[in-house]
């Protein structure tokens, strides 16, 4: 969405998408909505992350763990904190923006609450830096297009 914090990162992006869903928690903050979405990550997504981590460890990429944060949802988050596999970059009542960056690629994820429409939008923007990042995105991009809608369908 135009008013999302990640919109400015679209220029030059190698991958981007956005998925909209009904807001199951219309009174909640963006962070609480994000925690609810990742808290109900389907088991097959967890298994896919485990497989991803096992494979990429062999080629020198980092093990991200799973999407769901280890801490409970009652924790007060601040910019700079880790939230699951991401670092928190922006936090407001209506939007949470997180990133994971390394020398191969930068990933930006946003959950934006469209309160008037009672919707949430999860957006992803990826900037690839080198050949290993491009190689990594070959299988990840199509799987990502399955994972986010599946997570939103369970929230």
Model regions: which residues?
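Short, solvent-exposed loop/turn segments at secondary-structure junctions
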Residues: 26, 103-105, 127
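Long, compositionally biased interface segments
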Residues: 145-155
């Amino acid at each position: 969405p135009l008013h999302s914090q990640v919109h400015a990162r679209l220029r030059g992006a190698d991958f981007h998408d956005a998925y909209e869903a009904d807001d199951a928690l219309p009174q909640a903050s963006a962070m609480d909505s994000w925690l609810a979405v990742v808290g109900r990550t389907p088991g097959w997504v967890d298994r896919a992350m485990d497989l991803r981590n096992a494979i990429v460890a062999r080629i020198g990429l980092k093990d991200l763990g799973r999407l769901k944060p280890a801490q409970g949802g009652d924790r007060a988050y601040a910019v700079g904190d880790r939230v699951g596999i991401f670092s928190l970059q922006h936090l407001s009542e209506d939007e949470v923006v997180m990133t994971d960056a390394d020398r191969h690629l930068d990933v930006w994820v946003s959950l934006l609450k469209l309160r008037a429409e009672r919707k949430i939008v999860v957006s992803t923007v990826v900037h690839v830096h080198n050949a290993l990042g491009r190689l990594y995105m070959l299988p990840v991009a199509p799987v990502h297009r399955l994972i986010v809608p599946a997570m939103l369908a369970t929230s």
